[in-house]
């Protein structure tokens, strides 16, 4: 009996060890995945389409997450081959783009919701937050209202070609700076630095978003004179650009928002930056993208900027939209952001709130349909 039990234990342990060994092998070596209809185009949906590969060994941890997060979309080997070959010339489909713009405007009055204005709020009015409980409020102060524009900063504005620049590590070494700077209007995300990365991301900035949490993360909540000087100098570099501050997304931004308001009042007239403070815009934006089967906890800043750009731009080019930890052109490891310090590990914290692979899948399909140009290869 005892020998029988020992045999059973040994058998179980053997199976466990075998499973672990197989898992290690699957993570280290190339992993062949059964073909799926990832990209809704005939090329990828055809019966003869190639098998898919999660081909980068350095990406093994992301592959493991595929089983934990159903929104994680593997990238096809054929897409990589397509990028490495001479890409087919992208053609703008103006009719499709105008149709999409009309659809967006049916859900979102972009011009009106781009920013609160002095006439749209009153002192003492209580603002709620898009992603927080309705019990949380922010009272509009006289100082806050004084910083609001008289009219929407994008009222009657129209641009031919706009660049929406995300912060993906795929921009590292891309040499896309000159191409981006040729755009008539450049959207950037989350106050991303450009000075040390101009060759890859350009220097031109017409609008950048500024999540209030940036003040805490990079400027120590302006607690010291040095912190305040650093922030002032960063703002001065914007030189007339729009600083788009989504202060009403989360109630946790309230204290930082008040710090920002005090700072801008203190330096009134010393900075050329244009301030824009959107109200509760996300309920409208979310409604549109939900119709496109995109409904994460939070949309990314990049796709939000695309939404805004659709109202004032005749053509939109996307850069830095690639949420994966490897370069599809070289198969080398990538940082999450192009400005991350060398050696910084690719992060997947975004999975808590965003569906970046699903967003990428949608944008890639839009690229194929000619609605927007999605740059995934080097520009020079």
UniProtKB/Swiss-Prot annotation:
Bilayer topology annotation: Single-pass type II membrane protein
Highest taxon above the source species: Eukaryota
Residue runs in coiled coils: none
One annotated GO biological process: sialylation
Keyword field contains Transmembrane helix: yes
Pathway entry: Protein modification; protein glycosylation
UniProt-listed Enzyme Commission number(s): 2.4.3.-, 2.4.3.8
Family assignment from sequence similarity: Belongs to the glycosyltransferase 29 family.
Protein name as catalogued: Alpha-N-acetylneuraminate alpha-2,8-sialyltransferase ST8SIA3
Organism of provenance: Pan troglodytes
């Amino acid at each position: 009996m005892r020998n029988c039990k020992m045999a059973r234990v040994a058998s179980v342990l053997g199976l466990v060890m075998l499973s672990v060994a197989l898992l290690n092998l699957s993570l280290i070596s190339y992993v062949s995945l059964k073909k799926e209809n990832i990209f809704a185009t005939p090329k990828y949906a055809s019966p003869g389409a190639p098998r898919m590969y999660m081909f980068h060994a350095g990406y093994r941890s992301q592959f493991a997450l595929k089983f934990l997060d159903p929104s994680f979309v593997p990238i096809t080997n054929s897409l990589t081959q397509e990028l490495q070959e001479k890409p087919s010339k992208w053609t703008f489909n103006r009719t499709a783009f105008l149709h999409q713009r009309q659809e967006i405007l049916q859900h979102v009055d972009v011009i009106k919701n781009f920013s609160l204005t002095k006439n749209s709020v009153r002192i003492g009015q209580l603002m709620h937050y898009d992603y927080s409980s309705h019990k949380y409020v922010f009272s509009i102060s006289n100082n806050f209202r004084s910083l609001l524009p008289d009219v929407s900063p994008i009222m009657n504005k129209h641009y031919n070609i706009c660049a929406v620049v995300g912060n993906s590590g795929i921009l590292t070494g891309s040499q896309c700076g000159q191409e981006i700077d040729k755009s008539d209007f450049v959207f950037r995300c989350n106050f991303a630095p450009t000075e040390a990365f101009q060759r890859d991301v350009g220097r031109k900035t017409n609008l950048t978003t500024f999540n209030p949490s940036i003040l805490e993360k990079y400027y120590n909540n302006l607690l010291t004179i040095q912190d305040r000087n650093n922030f002032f100098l960063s703002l001065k570099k914007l030189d007339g650009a729009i600083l788009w501050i989504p202060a009403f997304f989360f109630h946790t931004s309230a204290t930082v928002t008040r710090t920002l308001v005090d700072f801008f009042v203190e330096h009134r007239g010393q900075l050329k930056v244009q301030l824009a403070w959107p109200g509760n815009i996300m309920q409208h934006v979310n409604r549109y993208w939900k119709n496109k089967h995109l409904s994460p906890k939070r949309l990314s800043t990049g796709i939000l900027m695309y939404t805004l750009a659709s109202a004032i731009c005749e053509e939109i080019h996307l850069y830095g939209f690639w949420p994966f930890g490897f370069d599809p052109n070289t198969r080398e490891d990538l940082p999450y952001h192009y400005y991350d310090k060398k050696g910084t590990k690719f992060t997947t914290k975004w999975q808590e709130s965003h569906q970046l692979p699903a967003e990428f899948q949608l944008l890639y399909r839009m690229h194929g349909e000619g609605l927007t140009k999605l740059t995934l290869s080097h520009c020079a």
